[in-house]
Amino acid sequence: EDGELILERQYRHGLGVVSTEICAGVVEDGELPLHAAQRELEEETGYTGGEWEEIMTIAPNPGVMDNLCHCFYARGVKKTNNQHLDATEDIEVFLCSKEKVKEMLLRGDFIQALMVAPLWKYFTLQKDDNKR
């Protein structure tokens, strides 16, 4: 709501590093992608509400996988709860200015393509909104 983006840090075993990320998760059977995104944001960060918009749908690896990643932008969310993490999750949540996130993108601080693509899309949409 104050112009900052919600980011997370968590250890990723595959690369053996602490990764800076945006909130993400799995759509459960029978669940709509929007509802999954809202649930994951609340569970991982404690933020709820706001206005939600799907900004892109991407295929992580269409050569060998059939899953899709639905990417949402949530505007005006508020911290209303504590984290409700799974037993295997250890997530540090922090707020970051848009300018700082853009600098982090340019430096390569985000290592997951599924995080980088929606962040660049977000900044492209912000730039387009400013032209209007």
Stretch-by-stretch model annotation:
Residues 46-47, 110:
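Helix N-cap/coil-helix junction residues
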Residues 1-39, 77, 85-87:
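Conserved Nudix-box catalytic region and its N-terminal flanking loop in Nudix hydrolases
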Residues 48-55:
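A short coil-to-beta-strand element that immediately follows conserved catalytic motifs
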Residues 61-81, 94:
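Active-site-adjacent beta-strand/loop module that shapes the phosphate/pyrophosphate-binding cleft
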Residues 18, 29, 54, 63, ...:
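Nudix hydrolase/Nudix homology domain
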